[in-house]
């Protein structure tokens, strides 16, 4: 996206950084090289997955998802594979999400692709969660959307000072999927609700402090960490954890820096404890602090339908298993593909680039409980199955 497009987006969001992170999440390619877009290699004691589209921030395609799932299952059964490592090529991104533009373009030409991508991606997310081998995600750089899905459900997630986490889907008429309804409400207090509704980004050690990552390692030591993991001889889960803990303990970058949201957490927990988006908005308005008004401004730019879907998704997901959440999210994904706001969000940000989505409905009060029920209803025989 050119400078002019960036400037237009800056006027729609309250900070360049938040705008840039959403743009990075949404930038997609119009072509892929299926043979090279993901590398699957046996190295030492490990199976290594490299998301290999650095020019496009390692965004996921359906072909990549299929290759990763098939190899994951093979390595899980291979007695010579003791752990699985997933990482992104290049230094900018682990994985900035899924092929959003391709999804929108498939609306009128390839309905099966809309079903297949979400179904197979969610099945992969669940397979990572249930993987019998230690699964280590090196989430250096941008990690959003689909990138979160192929990392956060793994046993170990290693952040660096360059890690950037965000779930900005409400800005384009979607919801934080790939199991967001499971892991977000399980973060401390109401942090996950805040992240889901605002698209707020976490960077560096904050990704670890928030609980997205299990370990923090200085970027300059990340290559050595990988080498030491690969050199292990028939390691147990405990051996792997010991190596990660050793590197974590030696990593001092921003060690004494407070969590970016630390001073606001009590208020976040209060504001986002409300059972409706309308009440959350009222809470922010009544507070009136600069931080509250900043978040209010962001929320008012989001799709009203997406906001309501997301709040209900997290509330229901807080008491569901991951497979149950993914079944729910598959229903939501298919409803969003048939709805207005996702395609309008893609149009405004990626196609016409006017950065002025016209949401329908345009106001929270116009999104009724009946509307929401339609998004969450069962698909019958078409429901996601594992």
UniProtKB/Swiss-Prot annotation:
Pathway: Amino-acid degradation; L-valine degradation. Residues 1-32 form a transit peptide. One of its GO terms (biological process) is valine catabolic process. The keyword 4Fe-4S does not apply. It comes from the Eukaryota. Keywords: Acetylation, Branched-chain amino acid catabolism, Hydrolase, Mitochondrion, Phosphoprotein, Transit peptide. The modification N6-succinyllysine is found at residues 92, 221, 250, 257, 297, 301, 353, 377. Substrate binds at residues 121, 146, 169, 177. It catalyses: 3-hydroxy-2-methylpropanoyl-CoA + H2O = 3-hydroxy-2-methylpropanoate + CoA + H(+). Its EC number is 3.1.2.4. The modification Phosphoserine is found at residues 234, 356. Disulfide bonds: none annotated. The modification N6-acetyllysine is found at residues 92, 221, 297, 353, 360, 365. The keyword Phosphoprotein applies. GO terms for cellular component: mitochondrion. Belongs to the enoyl-CoA hydratase/isomerase family. Hydrolyzes 3-hydroxyisobutyryl-CoA (HIBYL-CoA), a saline catabolite. Has high activity toward isobutyryl-CoA. Could be an isobutyryl-CoA dehydrogenase that functions in valine catabolism. Also hydrolyzes 3-hydroxypropanoyl-CoA. This is 3-hydroxyisobutyryl-CoA hydrolase, mitochondrial. It comes from Bos taurus (Bovine). The gene is HIBCH.
């Amino acid at each position: 996206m050119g400078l002019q497009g960036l400037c237009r987006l800056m006027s729609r969001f309250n900070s360049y950084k938040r705008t840039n992170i959403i743009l990075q999440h949404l930038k997609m390619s119009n072509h892929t090289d299926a043979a090279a877009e993901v590398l699957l290699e046996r190295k030492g004691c490990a199976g290594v997955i490299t998301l290999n589209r650095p020019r496009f921030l390692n965004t996921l395609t359906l072909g990549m998802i299929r290759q990763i799932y098939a190899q994951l299952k093979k390595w899980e059964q291979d007695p010579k594979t003791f752990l699985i490592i997933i990482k992104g090529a290049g230094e900018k991104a682990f994985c900035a999400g899924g092929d959003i533009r391709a999804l929108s373009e498939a609306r009128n030409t390839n309905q099966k692709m809309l079903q297949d991508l979400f179904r197979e991606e969610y099945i992969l997310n669940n397979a990572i969660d249930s993987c019998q081998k230690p699964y280590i995600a090196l989430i250096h750089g941008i990690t959003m959307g689909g990138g979160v899905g192929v990392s956060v459900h793994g046993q170990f997630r290693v952040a660096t000072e360059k890690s950037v986490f965000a779930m900005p889907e409400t800005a384009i008429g979607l919801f934080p999927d790939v199991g967001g309804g499971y892991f977000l409400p399980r973060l401390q207090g109401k942090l996950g609700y805040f992240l889901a509704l605002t698209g707020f980004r976490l960077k560096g050690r904050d990704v670890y402090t928030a609980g997205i990552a299990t370990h923090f390692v200085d970027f300059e030591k990340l290559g050595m960490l990988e080498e030491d993991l690969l050199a292990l001889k028939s390691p147990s889960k405990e051996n792997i954890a010991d190596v990660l803990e050793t590197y974590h303990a030696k990593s001092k970058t921003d060690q004494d820096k407070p969590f970016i949201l630390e001073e606001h957490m009590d208020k976040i927990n209060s504001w986002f404890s409300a059972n409706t988006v309308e009440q959350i908005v009222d809470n922010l308005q009544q507070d009136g602090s600069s931080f509250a008004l900043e978040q209010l401004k962001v929320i008012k730019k989001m799709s009203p339908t997406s906001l309501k879907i997301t709040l209900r998704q997290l509330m229901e997901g807080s008491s569901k298993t991951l497979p149950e959440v993914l079944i729910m999210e598959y229903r939501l994904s298919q409803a969003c593909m048939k709805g207005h706001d996702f395609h309008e969000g893609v149009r405004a940000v990626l196609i016409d680039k006017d950065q002025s989505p016209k949401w329908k409905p345009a106001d929270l009060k116009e999104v009724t409980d009946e509307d929401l029920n339609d998004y969450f209803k069962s698909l019958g025989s078409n429901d996601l199955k594992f």
